[in-house]
């Protein structure tokens, strides 16, 4: 990330990148307008958010709150790894999978599919078979849960996932790795690493500290 101070008439061009999925643009003291759930973003499918839930149009003015100058700061952190290691906890249905299936899940690379969207990240790789019927009793889902579908491919639940699901859940991505996961583009390679709950909790505490430090530098 990098900070900029803009004066009247200045223009800032924001270019796209093929190294990550999302980019973030932050204004000191934030935007004016309606905030829903502490956000002024727009969800056009649900028709909620600022701008009456409608998509912002080209050349439409967006107003910001009065702010002061910001100290210049720059930090570059690229995703250059050929394989992204994502840490997970064992899922609620972990026992539904054979030892062979578990070994396949943790020993092999998976590729992010082009079919990935905000509901789920679909992965392609060696098939994972379970010991029960593919469709089990539906259970509640949370962000980061990894289900194994009927074709044996894992799918990771993302921000717009459904509330319940009936596929076996082999694992769940730990909270401190979730943001990094969602920046992976189609074609990226993933390997999963199992961690215990206490380690995941400690990693999340470190993640919170790092995130707060970043926010304090750009506010």
Where are these regions (language model features)?
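Conserved "landmark" site that anchors the functional core of diverse proteins
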Residues: 1-219
């Amino acid at each position: 990330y990098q900070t900029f101070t803009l004066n009247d008439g200045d223009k800032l061009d924001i270019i796209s990148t093929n190294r990550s999925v999302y980019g973030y643009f932050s204004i000191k003291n934030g935007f004016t307008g309606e905030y829903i759930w502490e956000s002024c973003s727009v969800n056009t499918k649900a028709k909620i958010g600022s701008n009456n839930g409608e998509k912002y149009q080209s050349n439409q003015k967006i107003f910001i709150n009065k702010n002061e100058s910001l100290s210049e700061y720059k930090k570059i952190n690229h995703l250059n790894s050929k394989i992204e290691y994502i840490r997970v906890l064992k899922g609620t249905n972990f026992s539904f999978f054979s030892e062979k299936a578990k070994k396949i899940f943790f020993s092999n690379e998976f590729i992010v599919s082009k079919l990935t969207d905000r509901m789920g990240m679909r992965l392609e790789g060696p098939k994972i078979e379970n010991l029960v019927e593919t469709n089990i009793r539906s259970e509640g889902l949370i962000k980061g849960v990894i289900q194994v579908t009927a074709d044996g491919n894992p799918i990771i639940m993302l921000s717009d996932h459904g509330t319940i699901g009936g596929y076996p859940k082999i694992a769940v991505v730990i909270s401190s790795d979730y943001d990094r996961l969602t920046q992976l583009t189609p074609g990226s390679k993933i390997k999963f690493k199992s961690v215990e709950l206490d380690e995941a909790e400690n990693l999340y505490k470190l993640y919170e500290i790092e995130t707060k430090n970043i926010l304090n530098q750009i506010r």
